[in-house]
């Protein structure tokens, strides 16, 4: 009985054929040009209350998904500190969830639920199922790509900058799109089909018909669109956990041989990447929780007792799967520090009750990549080791106003990051002036207020990494104001240059 599809007597089914022999259960009323799979006619018609519950639920989930994912795309695309190659995957995932929410949820499913049947015709039923398939598959394929990226960054940090380049990330995203489309398009060519399901208010893959074509398509879809991606994701995160444990053990040894500040910087960087990996794992777990019941329903329908699949049993997993598109923005808002800060800057009223915590790590807020080499000064009164920094991140602002030239000869070359101001750079970025300037031989530029420093001695003040609060005048001795250098080298004290 479950091996056939049916239509209302005398009307064409989803594939344009006639089936006049089917006698539907009284009370099942399909749209004028749609087929109702014979499987669903063995059950009583769905009550009006359930249709309204689904309609209200999908409206809420759809609107939250649209607003949340639009926010994610905007924040990640317009925040410099978030525009890294790895975050392109996050943007792609948000775009996928946004389209999924806008097409497969609100408003099409909402309108059909309130009408208690699919009202948009056969063509739109197939397009609806196709879009749901493409962007549902794109979500899990993107999560697979994210797990691979996290594996490389965490376990092979030295090779990550060459392996996960922006160009390669773009290529991986193209592969994700192509694979998702290829897995969703066969029903248009007779391998499988898109038909109404459950409450007859939405359309999806035909997982009920047990012909050879339909069954092989469901198996291929299940393997390449669900099981294999989950295996890859699982392997990557297991390797990440093992890599983190090895890293913790190595840090115990490295800390004894490295300067405390350098060890802290390296550990801070690793912990930052690990935090991002935990966010990715959370998103993945939520996706699996949302879609696993739906995948199980399809398997039972094909290889188990199909009579278990009642309209309500099929509809509840569908509702859970639709909600997957709204999870990710919530996870980022609760767990991603940079996303929270950027969101607070643009829509502070969202944080009326809980302002994001500001961590004392200015370098993390501004810089994403940093290479450090050490050079020793020669023919200079300064005999300490000076750090040579090069930053690949763009600056918040660059100014030469108020610069004072020191007349004392120096013989070292240095790239420095200099900021000026009193406010926290995370909440008041416009008040900070940040510059990356190379100090030439014989020229030391002091990026500070000329008015405060014109008649005073010039002090080269070094502040250790991750210190972003401005010291008091008393702590600086005779130096009013102050120059703040965010660096990762040794601490240098007492270098005085007379103007």
Swiss-Prot record:
Q: Which family does it belong to?
A: Belongs to the G-protein coupled receptor 1 family. Opsin subfamily.
List the ranges whose topology is Cytoplasmic.
Answer: 76-87, 149-168, 245-278, 336-499
> InterPro entries of this UniProt entry?
GPCR_opsins, GPCR_Rhodpsn, GPCR_Rhodpsn_7TM, Opsin, Retinal_BS
Q: What is the documented function of this protein?
A: Visual pigments such as rhodopsin and porphyropsin are light-absorbing molecules that mediate vision. Rhodopsin consists of an apoprotein, opsin, covalently linked to 11-cis-retinal. This receptor is coupled to the activation of phospholipase C. Porphyropsin consists of opsin covalently linked to 11-cis 3,4-didehydroretinal.
Which species is the source of this protein? Mizuhopecten yessoensis (Japanese scallop)
In which tissues has expression of this protein been reported? Retina. Expressed in the depolarizing cell layer of the photoreceptor cells distant from the lens.
Protein name as it appears in the record:
Rhodopsin, GQ-coupled
Entry-linked PROSITE patterns = G_PROTEIN_RECEP_F1_1, G_PROTEIN_RECEP_F1_2, OPSIN
Transmembrane ranges, per UniProt, are: 51-75, 88-114, 129-148, 169-192, 217-244, 279-302, 311-335
Disulfide feature: 125-203
């Amino acid at each position: 009985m479950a091996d056939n599809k049916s239509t209302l007597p005398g009307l064409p089914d989803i594939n344009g054929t006639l089936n006049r022999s089917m006698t539907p259960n009284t009370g099942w009323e399909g749209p004028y040009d749609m087929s109702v799979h014979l499987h669903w006619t063995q059950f009583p018609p769905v009550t009006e209350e359930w249709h309204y519950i689904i309609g209200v639920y999908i409206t809420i989930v759809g609107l939250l998904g649209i607003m949340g994912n639009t926010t994610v795309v905007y924040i990640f695309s317009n925040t410099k500190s978030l525009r890294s190659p790895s975050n392109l995957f996050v943007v792609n995932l948000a775009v996928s969830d946004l389209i999924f929410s806008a097409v497969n949820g609100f408003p099409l499913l909402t309108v059909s639920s309130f009408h208690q049947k699919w009202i948009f015709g056969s063509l739109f039923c197939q397009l609806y199922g196709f879009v749901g398939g493409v962007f549902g598959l794109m979500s899990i394929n993107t999560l697979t790509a994210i797990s691979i990226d996290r594996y490389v960054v965490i376990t092979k940090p030295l090779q990550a900058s060459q392996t996960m380049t922006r160009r390669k990330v773009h290529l991986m995203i193209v592969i994700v799109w192509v694979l998702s489309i290829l897995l969703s398009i066969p029903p248009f060519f007779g391998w499988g089909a898109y038909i109404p399901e459950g409450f007859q208010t939405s359309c999806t893959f035909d997982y009920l018909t047990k012909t050879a074509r339909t069954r092989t398509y469901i198996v291929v879809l299940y393997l390449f669109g669900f099981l294999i991606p989950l295996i890859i994701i699982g392997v990557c995160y297991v390797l990440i956990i093992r890599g983190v444990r090895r890293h913790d053990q190595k840090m115990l040894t490295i800390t004894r041989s490295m300067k405390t500040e350098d060890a802290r910087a390296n550990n801070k960087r690793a912990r930052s990447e690990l935090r991002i990996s935990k966010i990715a794992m959370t998103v993945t777990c939520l996706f699996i929780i949302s879609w696993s019941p739906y995948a199980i329903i399809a398997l039972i329908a094909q290889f188990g007792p199909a009579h278990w699949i009642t309209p309500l049993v099929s509809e509840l997993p569908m509702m859970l799967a639709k909600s997957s598109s709204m999870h990710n923005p919530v996870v980022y808002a609760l767990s991603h520090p940079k996303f929270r800060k950027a969101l607070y800057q643009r829509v502070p009223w969202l944080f009326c009750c809980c302002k994001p915590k500001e961590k004392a790590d200015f370098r993390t807020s501004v810089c994403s990549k940093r290479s450090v080499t050490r050079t020793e000064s020669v023919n200079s009164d300064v005999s300490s080791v000076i750090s040579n920094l090069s930053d690949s991140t763009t600056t918040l602002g660059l100014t030469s106003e108020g610069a004072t030239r020191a007349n004392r000869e120096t013989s070292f070359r240095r790239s420095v990051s200099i900021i000026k101001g009193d406010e926290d750079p995370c909440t008041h970025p416009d008040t900070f002036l940040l510059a990356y300037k190379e100090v030439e031989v014989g020229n030391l530029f002091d990026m500070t207020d000329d008015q405060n420093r014109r008649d005073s001695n010039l002090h080269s003040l070094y502040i250790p990494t991750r210190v972003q609060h401005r010291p008091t005048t008393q702590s600086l001795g005779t130096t009013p104001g102050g120059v703040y250098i965010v660096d990762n080298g040794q601490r240098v004290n007492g270098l005085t240059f007379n103007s």
